[in-house]
Amino acid sequence: PTDFQAVKKAVIAHNIEMVIVGPEAPLVNGVHDFFLANDELKNIPVIGPKKDGALLEGSKDFSKEFMFKHGIPTAKYQSFTKDNLQEGKLFLETLTPPYVLKADGLAAGKGVLILDSLDEAKAELEEMVSNQKFGDASSTVVIEEFLKGIELSVFVLTDGISYKILPSAKDYKRIGEGDQGLNT
């Protein structure tokens, strides 16, 4: 839920002693910061990053910039908006298929397109940035080179001093057999 006042009421009414935030949207919108800034909630532990940390999940463009800045290996990329759409189409021409287009913002797991056709990739880029195929999430689109391999999520708990690595998880995103079809 992103209605933080309603969350506050529920936490107080039910005497909740710890909050574990699962969905990305409340984190990106600053639920952890809301707890820290509120006298009635600031002593309740919240598991989940503050708004600044959640931006790593909430913006693909920010994440890519962060990875490049800190020397973290990642695919070659560029970001585009409707203002530089033609440059985006030209960038697609420099890549080898398949083409990867990612809505910059949160799109409920649906904002990534992997396309084999250059013409289709150009059309989808235009649909994303000009017609907001994924709403505001696709006002900026990250185009990156395709990397073949297994995608894993690694989870780490930290208090800012120490950390604990949790088990990794593989998300089987595609609807069809053989990792084909749309994301689920």
Residue ranges and their predicted role:
Residues 11, 15-17:
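Proline-aspartate-enriched helix->loop->beta-strand connector
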Residues 1-10:
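Glycine-rich, highly charged phosphate/nucleotide-binding loops
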Residues 128-132, 147-184:
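Phosphate-binding core of ATP-grasp and ATP-grasp-like enzymes
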Residues 80, 112-117, 156-159, 166-167:
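Short beta-strand-to-turn element immediately C-terminal to the catalytic PLP-Schiff-base lysine
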Residues 53-70, 85, 114, 118-120:
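Rossmann-fold NAD(P)-binding glycine/threonine-rich loop
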Residues 73-76, 94-100, 115-153:
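Conserved ATP-binding module of the ATP-grasp superfamily
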Residues 17-59, 71-82:
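A short, GP-enriched loop/loop-strand-helix hinge that lies immediately N-terminal to
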